[in-house]
C-alpha cells in the first residue's frame, strides 16, 4: 500500500477518534450545567486534534493529483463518504455546545408552517400575548396559542427575542419543512440539513468531475470538523448554501440561466452570495445581452424572494439590528472601526460601509480585471468568500463554510494552506465562554482571537506574495 494511502487512513482514524471524544464530552455542556464546570480544555483539545487530522489530508490529497506514481484506490471516496456520514449521524444525539440559534429556527419553522409571516411579530410579542388576560390582534393571538400549546415556552428562550427573524424566506421554507416532519424537534432540523447537505455534496462531486479533479478532494469539505460540528451539534443553517452555490458554479459556464436561478436561491437563504455574481458570470462579460440579462434576472428574483422581509423592515427587524450593530468574534472589523473613530462620530456604521465597499471592489476586480480563465473561478470564489469572513463584523466558525465549500476545487492553489489553518484555530471560539465566565474574556479578544485569524492570514499573505503572479 502506498505511503500516502497509509497516511490518509491514519489521519481519518485520528479524526474519527477525536470526534468520538467530542461526542462523549458534549453531555457535560447540557443546558442547566455550570459553565465553570464545563470540560472546555478537553473539548478544545479534541477540536484541535480533529483540525490537525483534517489539515494533514491537504498535502496527501495534493499528491493524489500531482504524482503519477500514486494510484488512488477506488475505495477512498466511498470510505470518505461513509466516515463523513457517520460523524454527522454521531452528532445527532449530542448536546449542543454553547449554541441555541436552533431555537429560532424551530420557532420560525412553526410560524411559517402555520401560514403566518415570521417577519411580522417578534417572539417577545408572541410570548407576551400568550399570558393570561393579554389582548392582541387575532393573528398574534393565534401564534400565542401555538406558543403555549405546542412550543412549551420556546419563545422565551430564543436569542434576541425582541427582534423579528433575520433569516430570509428560502431558509424559512427549510425550517417549515423540519416542522412538518416533527414539530419543534431538533433531530428533524438536523435531518433536513443533512438532506440538503447531501445535495450540496452531489453538486461538489459533479463540479470536481466536470473539471477533471479527483473525487477524493471532496474530503476537504466532507470531513472538515468545523462544518460537521457547527452543523450537527451547533445546528447552524449555513450548510444550506452549499447546494445552490456549488450548483451555480457547476452551471455558470454552460447554462448561465440555471446558474442565475441557483445563485438567486442562495441569496434567498442568506443575502451575501450576491457578492459572488461578478466572478461566477465573468465569462459572459464580453456578451452584454447575456451578461446584463443574467444580472437583471438575479436582481428580479432576489428582490421578489426577499420582498416579505423588505416589506416588514422596521426597528424591530432582525436584519436591521444585525447589519447595524452586531459585532462578535470579529478580527479586522474592530480595527477598521476604531481607526475611523479618530475622525468621525459614528465609526460603527462607517466601518460597515467601508468594508462593504472593499468587498464590492474586490468582487468587481476579480470579475472584470482578472483574466476570464474558468479554471481560476473556484479559487477566486474561495478568496472572495474568505475576505468576507476576515472582514465581517461577526467571525463565527460556521461562517467558514462560506469558503470551505470551494476548497476542494483549489487544493493546489496557493491560498489553500493559509485558509485551511482556520479550522484549527476555530477551537478558540469555544474557549471564550468559560474564559468569559472566569473573567478572562480580554485574553480571548487580545490573544486567542488574533492568533485564530492572524496566523492563517499571515500564512495566506506569505503564500500570496510568493505566488503574486498567479492570483
Task: Go through each PLM region and give its residues.
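Multi-pass membrane glycosyltransferase architecture that uses lipid-linked
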Residues: 1-327, 337, 345, 349-471
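Short alpha-helix
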Residues: 332
